[in-house]
């Protein structure tokens, strides 16, 4: 990706979607603050959160590492996903790729399964559903983001469990 002062997480997502490995795979999606921005819930996204199936993780991780430096990731006491990698674009924007998401709280590990069938496409990008990120933000302990997405869904008649 060419250097530019206007690099955004969404612009990085568009660039990634054109890489052969990402273009061939239908088993990854965009979430996190980039999804919140796409839905008009925040003005700016901080980073780019990508979720994929465990089977796709290695291929997509290799594609990212061919273009971007991979950052060291320390073991986290709460977040214990099967697969997790963090990369950094020269603009400073971080890209997190995760699969087999698991969270440990009070000695209980909760696994979350990514469902590619729930993806929706806009601007030729695969977006995760708001409902998926309500579940993830609940697991991650982010009540403000849960509230934003829940209100968004309720205002549009989208069922939230």
Give residue spans per PLM region.
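Conserved catalytic core of two-metal-ion nucleotidyltransferases
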Residues: 69-105
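Short secondary-structure junctions
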Residues: 26, 65-78, 117-118
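Helical scaffold of the NTase/Pol beta-like nucleotidyltransferase catalytic core
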Residues: 1-29, 147-150, 154-161
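Active-site nucleotide-donor binding segment shared across nucleotidyl transfer reactions
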Residues: 16-55, 59-61
């Amino acid at each position: 990706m060419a250097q530019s002062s206007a690099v955004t997480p969404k612009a990085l997502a568009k660039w990634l979607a054109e890489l052969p490995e990402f273009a061939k795979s239908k088993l990854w999606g965009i979430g996190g603050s980039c999804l919140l921005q796409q839905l008009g819930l925040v003005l700016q996204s901080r980073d780019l959160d990508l979720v994929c199936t465990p089977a796709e993780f290695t291929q997509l991780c290799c594609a990212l590492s061919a273009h971007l430096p991979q950052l060291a990731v320390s073991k986290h006491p709460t977040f214990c996903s099967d697969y997790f990698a963090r990369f950094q674009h020269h603009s400073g924007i971080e890209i997190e790729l995760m699969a087999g998401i698991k969270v440990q709280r009070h000695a209980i590990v909760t696994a979350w399964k990514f469902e590619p069938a729930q993806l929706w496409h806009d601007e030729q990008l695969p977006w995760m559903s708001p409902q998926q990120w309500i579940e993830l933000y609940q697991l991650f302990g982010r009540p403000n983001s849960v509230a934003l997405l829940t209100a968004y869904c309720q205002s549009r008649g989208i069922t939230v469990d």
